[in-house]
Amino acid sequence: DEDGKEKNVYSWRLDKNDPMPKGKKREPSLREKEKQIEADLFDHIVTNGGNYTVLELVEKYVSLKTGVRHNTVAGYKPVINMLKKESFGNLRIDKVRLSDAKAWLIKLQQIDGRGYSSIHSIRGVLRPAFQMAVDDDLLRKNPFEFELASVIVNDSVTREAITRKQQRDLLKFIQEDKHFSRYYDAIYILFHTGLRISEFCGLTVSEIEFGEMRIKVDHQLQRTAQMQYVIEEPKTDKGIRYVPMTEAVAACFRRIITNRKTPKVEPMVEGYAGFLFLDKNDMPMVALHWEKYMEHIIQKYNRIYRIQMPKVTPHVCRHTFCSNMAKSGMNPKTLQYIMGHADISVTLNTYTHVNFDDAKEEVYRIANS
């Protein structure tokens, strides 16, 4: 090999035209193996993929990912645990072909019943791990370098914005409900600012600037699986921003601050204190709290009314705000700034929901102007 060590290679056949002995599994001939070894040595490709298995390669890749966000690290663990149970994880990396990678992902969806988004996350770890192997001269090509949607069915449900009428009906229901009215101000703010839920949870009293009628957004609050509270930078570089407030939004914030419970000990997370909402343990509320509250609100609404309300989450509130602003004619670059998107294509394509009625209204507006 390239280290000068002598190694042996075996095959049941000398030449590719020789017959395979009866009962033996077909494999490359000795001459074919010799050519492959010579080519690998010439190109400085490490023979046998360095003897790494798929699992070992992914573990090495993850071990080198220092300085990433805690939720990114949390996403690696399920992939490693799954590979420990899968025979695919024990394959030597140089034995994995493009067709093997595709067949495995198809198996995950069609046999194991995994969803598209789950498989997308799995491939999101394996592709860069195998690319690391290519960069390290362990492999010639990356077997996971292909368009995922061309291999498995995208069965993920698109998170749609709700209509203006649905938004009005939902907010009216929350405001008038004896139990859920306590959450009205917060949900109104989510619908009318487009804040990410972790940004909203991270807000402190000092960041609501009533004089300037703006909200300072420079961090987000998250809670790990180990129940540890952490402060993270916003999701993108453009996430640090000031979000303007309307009078109605400002009124909601004033009521929230006025009604804010006074804890025995003010919780502090990495230097931040004065969080707007605290739970029963006097700790800051996180995204999971609001997701559950909204889930219960929708369940009660749909038990009462015949016309059902679709699933509404804090992120749907963000979609809805963006969609409403776009339909109202807001400049796309202004909307990108308010949303904190790094790429304007996300603003235009992912969050903006336009249907036929919107198109019809716009055509009539231009025709009559």
Language-model features: locations:
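N-terminal DNA-binding module of tyrosine recombinases/phage integrases
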Residues: 2-102, 258-272
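Conserved tyrosine-mediated DNA breakage-rejoining catalytic core shared by Y-recombinases
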Residues: 149, 203-261, 267-268
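Basic, Lys/Arg- and aromatic-enriched nucleic-acid-binding interface segment
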Residues: 120-122, 139-141, 145-203, 210-211, ...
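N-terminal core-binding DNA-recognition domain of tyrosine site-specific recombinases/integrases
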Residues: 22-26, 50, 62-140, 156, ...
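DNA/chromatin major-groove-contacting recognition/catalytic segments
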Residues: 170, 226-231, 328, 349, ...
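Catalytic-site neighborhood detector that most strongly recognizes the C-terminal catalytic loop/helix
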Residues: 153, 161, 220-221, 339-364
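Short, basic (Lys/Arg/His-rich) helix/loop patches that form interaction surfaces
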Residues: 172-183, 193, 243, 259-268, ...
